[in-house]
A protein has these predicted regions:
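Bacterial N-terminal signal peptides that target proteins for export
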Residues: 1-9
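Bacterial N-terminal signal peptides
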Residues: 10-17
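Extracytoplasmic c-type cytochrome modules immediately beyond a signal peptide or single-pass transmembrane anchor
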Residues: 21-168, 178-337, 350-372
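Short, cysteine/histidine-rich loop/knuckle motifs that typically chelate Zn2+
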Residues: 171, 343
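Cys/His-rich metal-chelating microdomains
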Residues: 175, 347
Length: 372
């Protein structure tokens, strides 16, 4: 009589266990969906991040390199900069950085364009781009965004207003023989910056407006913009002008009326981005920093710096916490690509390491995304 009762009890316990396990597993899957849904990033937010980084570099170069050096050193920015020993015009600097980023083949692309271009390559390439440009000229407070459905793939595109933020911009356009417009003033919308983000293969018959981007993809885009601007600044500004004995880069660049070091160029623009409080940050960090404030801020950054020093071909990524908030971080190797960088670190009295060579890993660029 006990055997049937035992079987009933055993079956009951087994059923309760299976039901409980099913509920736990279902909750675990739900939690994972909520987690990844929370950290994935809408393309509009990703485009805002990218534009903020582009704009910070554009403003700093225009105001603190071009305009400042024109006043303090009589060093001009000219169209034929390569042959005249001068600075690149702000739009040439952005063109060079966008070409560098676009050639990396990561999918994201950006470029400068205008309704009044001096060079036809900067004109809108479609009727929709022209409509978008007109929209941001009329209402510069909001970007013009849309999703393009090309075959089986989708692309998010956004046009942001490009303001006249430096005297060099208005002077060039107002005085250029090929300029269709010659009455620009400071603060005017002179054109737009278009950002193109691939969203992947289309999964439904209609355009999917709810596609999200993984944070590591967005971090890659941001790093691409940062690294491209730094590369152009190091190669075409610092190294070129120093090689020609025109102007040098120094640590005390403001007081000495000189060029900022490439590392300072990055740190100055990162501060501009940080001040806008968008939930985005990028910094230059190192295990052997000249300035201790540029060391790793947490254990994740320390481990990440060690990882990219051993495996510089890929970033070190992960989710952690900072100041009580969930963050996603990606650490990319910072390579010695400029003789100016090497000379500064190897000769600086406070440098812990003095034997850097070209293409050595000198530290890392950490991109931080605050998760909503």
């Amino acid at each position: 009589m006990f055997k049937p009762l035992f079987r009933v009890i055993l079956l009951t316990v087994l059923c309760i266990f299976l039901l409980s396990y099913s509920e736990v597993e279902e909750q675990r899957v739900t939690d994972m969906k909520l987690l990844w849904g929370a950290v994935d990033i809408p393309p509009k937010i990703a485009a805002d991040y990218i534009h903020t980084v582009i704009d910070a570099h554009r403003r700093f170069y225009s105001q603190h390199i071009v305009d400042r050096l024109a006043k303090t050193q009589s060093l001009q920015a000219t169209e034929d900069w390569a042959h005249e020993g001068t600075l690149l015009l702000p739009d040439q600097f952005l063109l060079a950085s966008s070409q560098t980023a676009n050639n990396q083949g990561i999918g994201m692309r950006y470029r400068l364009m205008s309704l009044w271009p001096i060079n036809e390559r900067n004109a809108p390439k479609s009727e929709l781009e022209k409509i978008g440009l007109k929209a941001v000229v009329d209402n510069p407070k909001e970007p013009f965004t849309w999703i393009v459905d090309k075959g089986s793939s989708q692309y998010f595109q956004a046009i942001y207003p490009d303001f006249a933020v430096a005297q060099s911009c208005t002077s060039c356009h107002n005085n250029h023989a090929k300029s269709p417009r010659n009455n620009f003033k400071m603060g005017d919308v002179m054109g737009g910056i278009i950002i193109n983000l691939p969203l992947g293969k289309r999964k439904v018959s209609k355009v999917d407006l709810k596609v999200l981007l993984p944070p590591e993809v967005v971090a890659n885009y941001i790093h691409s913009v940062v690294a491209s601007h730094r590369h152009v600044y190091s190669k075409y500004i610092v190294d070129r002008l120093q090689d020609k004995n025109i102007l040098r880069s120094t640590e005390n660049w403001l007081q000495e009326k000189a060029l900022p070091l490439p590392a300072q160029f990055l740190m100055e623009t990162s501060q501009v981005v940080r001040d806008r409080r968008l939930g985005l940050d990028f910094r230059l960090i190192s295990l052997q920093p000249i300035n201790r404030s540029n060391g790793p801020a947490n254990e994740f950054e320390r481990v990440g710096l060690e990882a990219v020093e051993v495996h510089p071909a890929r970033p070190y990524i992960g989710q952690t916490r900072l100041g009580g908030r969930d963050i996603f971080q990606a650490i990319y190797p910072d390579l010695a690509v400029s003789q100016g960088c090497i000379a500064c670190h190897n000769a600086h009295p406070q440098s812990p390491k003095k034997d850097y060579r070209m293409n050595d890993v000198m530290g890392g660029i950490v991109v931080t995304l605050y998760l909503q």
